[in-house]
């Protein structure tokens, strides 16, 4: 193969590999393996050491061993399930090989006197130790080769065997010399080059390579770099656009503060200043605002909104659910209507006439502020001069949804907010398209919620505690989490809890809110709870974000072992919003798994959202932690964002150097690792 042709061959379809026909091409593509080069970067998940031949005299049940010996007996048993029992000896002892379903062509090979190599797991049989269907080769033929390196095992699905993987990768490795190393002389000198590292990981002859091995680290760093560069490319494409300059004298903000019964915290003032500086520029703001539950992100959003409105531009604020959108709308009405500002509301449950009138007011410029759900970026909704988009609970939306809403304006500024904090090193990769601001202090008067963990068997004791709190005029949340992703079972569990509470606490008004209710029904129940007419609110996790009822000071979460740390922390944040001391009780049903026990321990001992987020990331891993929408391009083949945190710290400086010195390498690295998963023209 000529060099240039081989180099191009790495970019060819996997169909170029020996033995890969149309059916296998489809299976490989389902695993996101499209090119020969992709197969090279499909790394082993584990290894077996088959290089050493074990003496049969030393074998023990439960071991995995390679043996080499002579076939001394072959028994063909036809009674019941047809099988072959082959006895092999190496002079020190004997071993029986048990085989089923042997093809005719293979049966002829199993002859007394032939030499046989086998690898498999040993187990006790009727006649001593045996292997059932081991991997084997006849050792008395010229083509026999005993393994001279560790045997790799590859992640697999779609019915692809390990033998197929090893054959394809051996083929791809013949092209390794044509693989360019774009990071040569830019990495620690003790690390191998790209080609050397790949060969070592596929054909390791010494130690079993762990994720801490320099070869693994070399590839993990390049993958992290590719993801960082891809998201950064999106950001840079947005920075080249002109955005409206939203300068204001702060007159609306000062009038707003005059009506506010409290003052912003220093952390809020710092973040507001960062946002206002962004808004005053002619390039589009792309900023992520992270803040713990109850840290005051909504007030910061109000400050940004007033800056945009005073500058003469429209503002759109999007929430992931109607119940949260309704809460935001009510809050902004309370804050802004005294200033003479109308707050629009656009959600799917509103009547077609109201939605049409709201859309017409936005298009005509008669309405400057609208709060809603995904309805905001549907067809038929246009803005006269959209200057600022605010997205609450950012982790619920993907890049595509953000982009659709941004397209409603010429190039509006973007502020995304989340109470699900992401550790800084992770944010540098996940949100390389966004500047990050953090509200790192709670408003004065907010005290940590006392958190107790108790088994469900102590429910009678809990009812007594609830009775005492109700007599003191308090309100209570009772949360029933989703059961097996079934809304019907969820509803049944919630209704059963309502019946139990009504029986245990006669005369107490108990409300119910669940996922199968219409938005108007949910809003009615929430209004009754906020007014105090409903004393206990039984709910599913639909109340986990944004709901604000200062009179609620006790949160009880049933089956707390089913929920993740982020959900538990979000739910706990619904109490402790008034002046009184608040509590959260986590009810669990034993036995607990190790991870569930650890989650409940963290909740009992920790109130800091960033510490909880870090632990959540450790327990769940980056993919599950971020979710499919938010993870986006972070479907890592080699790297692990948590494990490779030290590598993440190296990425920004390396990316900066590459962008300045070798822009072509940037494109090639991103293409190598992400293929067609990134649309470089998109703005994050």
Curated annotation (Swiss-Prot):
E.C. number(s) listed in UniProt: 5.6.2.4
Any Pfam family matching the protein: Helicase_C
Annotated region described as Wedge domain, given as residue ranges: 51-148
Limits of the Helicase ATP-binding domain: 278-439
SMART domains associated with the record: DEXDc, HELICc
Catalytic activities: Couples ATP hydrolysis with the unwinding of duplex DNA by translocating in the 3'-5' direction; ATP + H2O = ADP + phosphate + H(+)
Enzyme class: isomerase
Binding-site residues, ATP: 291-298
Transit peptide in keyword set: no
Motif DEAH box: where in chain: 392-395
InterPro entries: ATP-dep_DNA_helicase_RecG, DEAD/DEAH_box_helicase_dom, Helicase_ATP-bd, Helicase_C-like, NA-bd_OB-fold, P-loop_NTPase, RecG/Mfd, RecG_dom3_C
Subunit relationships: Monomer.
Function: Plays a critical role in recombination and DNA repair. Helps process Holliday junction intermediates to mature products by catalyzing branch migration. Has replication fork regression activity, unwinds stalled or blocked replication forks to make a HJ that can be resolved. Has a DNA unwinding activity characteristic of a DNA helicase with 3'-5' polarity.
Domain note: The wedge domain within the N-terminus inserts into the replication fork junction, where the lagging and leading strand split.
Annotated PANTHER family: ATP-DEPENDENT DNA HELICASE HOMOLOG RECG, CHLOROPLASTIC
Name this polypeptide is given: ATP-dependent DNA helicase RecG
Species whose genome carries this gene: Acidithiobacillus ferridurans
Gene for this chain: recG
